Amino acid sequence: MASRAPLRAARSPQDPGGRAAPAATGRAPLPSAGWCPLPPGRNSSSRPRLLLLLLLLLPDAGAQKGDGCGHTVLGPESGTLTSINYPHTYPNSTVCKWEIRVKTGERIRIKFGDFDIEDSDYCHLNYLKIFNGIGVSRTEIGKYCGLGLQMNQSIESKGSEITVLFMSGIHASGRGFLASYSVIDKQDLITCLDTVSNFLEPEFSKYCPAGCLLPFAEISGTIPHGYRDSSPLCMAGIHAGVVSDVLGGQISVVISKGTPYYESSLANNVTSMVGYLSTSLFTFKTSGCYGTLGMESGVIADPQITASSVLEWTDHMGQENSWKPEKARLRKPGPPWAAFATDEHQWLQIDLNKEKKITGIVTTGSTLIEHNYYVSAYRVLYSDDGQKWTVYREPGAAQDKIFQGNKDYHKDVRNNFLPPIIARFIRVNPVQWQQKIAMKVELLGCQFTLKGRLPKLTQPPPPRNSNNLKNTTVHPKLGRAPKFTQALQPRSRNDLPLLPAQTTATPDVKNTTVTPSVTKDVALAAVLVPVLVMALTTLILILVCAWHWRNRKKKAEGTYDLPHWDRAGWWKGVKQLLPAKSVEHEETPVRYSNSEVSHLSPREVTTVLQADSAEYAQPLVGGIVGTLHQRSTFKPEEGKEASYADLDPYNAPVQEVYHAYAEPLPVTGPEYATPIVMDMSGHSTASVGLPSTSTFRTAGNQPPALVGTYNTLLSRTDSCSSGQAQYDTPKGGKPAAAPEELVYQVPQSTQEASGAGRDEKFDAFKETL
């Protein structure tokens, strides 16, 4: 019985109370309106008991029996059932019995979305009973009644069959009930009334039963923009095309922040109403196979669109009008395709060139306000070769699927195929229309590749004779009154759509929901693009980090006060340019300690030499008599010009063996190193060629005056000069040194100036000797 077709309860149009018409089985209808119930307390229960007795004695006429049945859809794996008039008050003295069967070996779970049955008589006349099994061998699971009863726990059967019995007697209120069922393995079953407010998770997956297209429920919103949080989940899923009303199915929901406005649309026979601001909305996760297949974009060429006939005429201005098949492109300006004839034999055909997975179709009317033409209902046929056609039916259905069309000439209406169609050719066969058959179409779907084999490519249909309706239409003659052309009838039976009165064979519907494999190019791009993006991002980060680290390293290396010179190598290079001296002089260099002046500003003190470096300024040699004196103990300052006038304090070293040209200053006085001055009394100043000003620097921009007396040179010197050199005591306001006195100066910063000056002065010194 798993292949049993879903059934819906039918209501008689003559019965305003909504009671079901008697089944066409030859049995008499149950007594209803002509019977008056007895007052309470006087055999008031005799009528319900009589109805129940008659119901049990009648032969089985289907899955439901009685006059108390409401909205009912009983599917092979799930379904929905309600009491009569739900959600309004159910009438007095009604009865309904539902017999539910699923696949052998399965069990059934029942869950109530709403339960409101009056319990004033302690479940004596108004109640709901559930039984294990069907028929006389059934056993009772439970008897239920109560207004606003919260039945949160589901009820499970012991076998694959259950019976649900609803009885109503005399009562004053009560909406009745709404229940849903499914096989036992659907652990996440929900009812048709559940909304997102019943769940706390931002994302979740639930199973919707069949039959959730409720006539009394309302939804707001559309896909992909989202649905208002007050919309029932399963009914919104039907509108979105992710679940079938006949079969039910799994839905995946994502909750997000609401929007101020929700638009209205018609899809899958569900009308979405306009909605306003809500705190949240929800959308559905889909397989992604809902893209357009090329009618609007032009991927489907004009020759791939054909029709049974074409509406052509000449207007009062003498202009020809032809609403050809290639005009049936959705959202393209201009007129639509329109058929010349107005019968159910007309069709619009689309060739996709190869098999594709078709998941939906969108239609609209003429889109012209002066031509209120549209198709309100249609069938869909499909084929692999364009010759043998199959009418689309829902799984397990015995009748062709009639799709809800448009209700006006300009709004879009969407219908989804569940399960999808796998075919190359699609035909739309209108069965109802407004004035004339006119429509624009777009197909939804994606590429189809069955795992394990290549896509099936079919050859185009062979050319037919001139009477083929798809290829030939009679064009009107020019200059005559408006004239309509009628296509000739086809000779081949395969070209003619099925008449409504004809009996059709069971279609070979490809009931498969296999997700198509993505083509190699798409899969390769999906993998390479993220990898390339990540690789480029990583490379950029590495380059930025390396550049930043290098800048920091350079900055750290540039914070030294003075560079460190190799004393030994520099000293040996200088000695080669000077006359030989005694070893004693070379082994007694003067060193000055580095006072912690590096923490002072450049204007306060000058930069001092490092404590472990004995670096001396080269002497300036003039035309003097005697041997070359020991070089000056002053070190040139890097990065500063000779005119910089900051003081450079030095700590005088205390040594037992004094340098030949320097003596320590008294402890009480300022400690300044002074230049070594040679006695020039016996020589001409013109031969020296050096200025007589001192190169000592003072605080300020003016050069200091040289004053003081000269001390005699020590006996360790190599010079025999008659003059005596003395240390100068720094005192302000003294006159400058005499021009005849030779002073040592700080060498120039550039190598060229120092080298040239040294050569010239050394030559002058040799000439003097």
From Swiss-Prot:
A single cellular component GO annotation: plasma membrane
Region (Disordered), start-end ranges: 1-39, 455-476, 719-769
UniProt keyword Plastid present: no
UniProt topological domain (Cytoplasmic) ranges: 545-769
Residues with PTM Phosphoserine: 601
Organism, scientific name: Rattus norvegicus
Biased composition (Basic and acidic residues): 757-769
Record-annotated disulphide pairs: 69-96, 123-145, 212-234, 289-446
Membrane topology: Single-pass type I membrane protein
Keyword set, alphabetical order: Disulfide bond, Glycoprotein, Membrane, Phosphoprotein, Signal, Transmembrane, Transmembrane helix
Amino acid composition bias (Polar residues), ranges on this chain: 465-474
Location(s), subcellular: Membrane
Gene3D superfamilies named among the record's database cross-references: Galactose-binding domain-like, LCCL-like domain, Spermadhesin, CUB domain
Protein name: Discoidin, CUB and LCCL domain-containing protein 2
GO molecular function: signaling receptor activity
Pfam family, one: LCCL
Lineage, top ranks: Eukaryota, Metazoa, Chordata, Craniata, Vertebrata
PROSITE patterns the record matches: CUB, FA58C_1, FA58C_3, LCCL
Residues in the signal sequence: 1-63
UniProt domain CUB: residue ranges: 69-184
Residue span(s) of domain F5/8 type C: 289-446
GO BP annotation list: negative regulation of cell growth; wound healing
